[in-house]
Regions:
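Active-site-proximal alpha-helix that buttresses catalytic centers in soluble enzyme cores
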Residues: 1-113, 124-179
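Conserved beta-strand position immediately N-terminal to the Walker
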Residues: 116
Length: 179
């Protein structure tokens, strides 16, 4: 059983209001894709979660990655972690639906030997925290793309910390409180 679960939100998305378009993996216009900044983050996550990365000691290289299933309006969770999964040569499981399958994802993750990374949509990330015994977890911030929720097993409980990715120029640099 895993002792280590890390959760991130998908990378930055397009914004019609700000005139920021999205692109798919081939560079073609796609409102369901990532913004250019999102693609920068997806690339930076490869080093961050790999043994080559220089990061906090509680960030580990995942042995499996879960991403919320793509749908007509968004492929962002898969696009965010696909470069990482390919670089590491680990499974990318993307058939679970955001807002419906969080308990199944967690059951699968808990039966994994080694660290797990979950990339999800912000509206449903707090469900994972609640299922791991942290009902105090609020909603993931609508404009937050640069944090990692880290859960480490301590006996029968899960310790929860929030770690900044600090990958891109305007990313938060200080740890966030879980209190």
């Amino acid at each position: 059983m895993t002792e280590h679960i890390m959760i991130i939100r998908h990378a930055e998305k397009p914004s019609v209001a700000e005139g920021i378009g999205g692109v798919d993996a081939d560079g073609q216009a796609s409102e369901g894709g990532l913004s250019v900044r999102g693609w920068q983050r997806a690339g930076a996550l490869v080093a961050y979660f790999s043994a080559r990365g220089t990061h906090a000691s509680h960030i580990a290289t995942p042995v499996v990655i879960f991403a919320a299933a793509s749908h007509a309006k968004s492929q962002r969770p898969v696009l965010t972690v696909q470069p990482l999964a390919e670089s590491l040569g680990v499974p990318l499981l993307s058939h679970y639906r955001s807002g419906a399958d969080e308990a199944q994802v967690l059951t699968h993750a808990l039966h994994t030997s080694g660290p797990v990374l979950i990339c999800w949509r912000h509206e449903s990330i707090s469900m994972f925290a609640h299922l791991l015994g942290h009902p105090e977890a609020g909603e993931w911030g609508q404009d937050c793309f640069d944090a990692v929720w880290v859960f480490r097993r301590e006996g029968e409980q899960w310790r929860w910390t929030i770690t900044p990715q600090a990958l891109l120029a305007s990313d938060e640099r200080l740890p966030r409180s879980t209190a």
